[in-house]
A protein has these predicted regions:
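A short, flexible loop at the N-terminus of ABC-type nucleotide-binding domains that lies
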Residues: 1-8, 12-25
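Conserved beta-strand-loop-alpha-helix hinge in the C-terminal portion
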Residues: 80-81, 85, 211-243, 249
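Helix-to-loop junction immediately C-terminal to a conserved catalytic motif
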Residues: 52
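Catalytic Walker B motif of ABC-type/P-loop ATPase nucleotide-binding domains
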Residues: 164-168, 173
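ABC nucleotide-binding domain "signature motif"
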Residues: 58-66, 216-217
Length: 251
């Protein structure tokens, strides 16, 4: 069995004002649960969109080994959007309704594919998200931020993707919602990249990758292991600096 993966091959990205956000990034994200960390503004969300194919790199290339589903940290929808649209299943539900009404358009059958039970699967996923009484036609504008995120997460699990990229998925979630998210991430059997500042969520990752102005650096283990490594690196850097100061005084 071939594992899903995402690969960066010498990827650079230049902003509209001509500034290079990052340059020559090369790394591979495999089937392990991976957390992407870094300070605000360093380019984590841009990197996520590059990996998902929503943006094109200024140089280099992104390789996607499988179907990717990307969940932005900004859950946006127009005023007429519904729960089904937010979950990404509205086109299939509409095609299914046309078929059930006697329609025979081949494009509708192509759209439905094997998803004849999509209504039941959506309802089951919404129940797992703690939203059991939420009809698909409910207006998205009536949802709180946490409810909208949970609907979007339901759509992510339903997407049948080989690789999930989740950007700050615990935003707006309460304690119960965060715990449910962790449990689903632990059950997810395929590729996973989570961009987050949530240390409790990152503690369940199998690998941490840090994006900094110097590029990407990979750390095995969860957030605690990463934090220990970074603390040792800072201590070593401080000791080296003190040693150099001492040597200069002796000159």
């Amino acid at each position: 069995m071939t594992h899903p993966y995402l690969a960066l091959e010498g990827v650079s990205y230049v902003l509209a004002d001509g500034r290079a956000l990052f340059s020559e990034l090369t790394d591979t994200f495999d089937h392990r649960r991976t957390g992407l960390v870094g300070r605000n503004g360093v380019g984590k969300s841009v990197l996520a969109r590059l990996l998902a194919g929503e943006l094109s790199p200024s140089a280099g290339r992104c390789v996607r080994g499988g179907k990717v589903h990307y969940l932005s940290q900004q859950i946006s929808s127009d005023g007429a959007a519904t729960v089904a649209q937010l979950a990404g299943v509205q086109p299939v539900l509409r095609a299914l309704a046309r078929i059930e009404s006697g329609g025979s358009d081949p494009s509708d059958f192509d759209l439905v594919g094997d998803d004849w039970d999509i209504r039941q699967r959506l309802q089951a996923e919404l129940e797992r998200q703690g939203l059991p009484a939420l009809p698909p036609e409910t207006g998205a504008a009536t949802l709180s931020g946490g409810e909208a995120m949970r609907v979007a997460l339901a759509g992510a699990w339903l997407a049948q993707a080989d690789f999930l990229i989740l950007d700050e998925p615990s935003n707006h979630l309460d304690r119960a919602g965060r715990q449910a998210l962790v449990e689903q991430l632990l059950r997810w059997p395929k590729g996973l990249l989570v961009i987050s500042h949530d240390r409790q969520l990152l503690a369940h990752m199998e690998r941490i990758v840090e994006l900094s102005p110097q590029g990407l650096r990979s750390y095995g283990g969860g957030y605690d292991f990463y934090a220990d490594c970074r603390a040792r690196e800072r201590d070593n850097a401080a000791q080296t600096l003190e040693q150099r100061k001492l040597e200069r005084r002796r000159e």
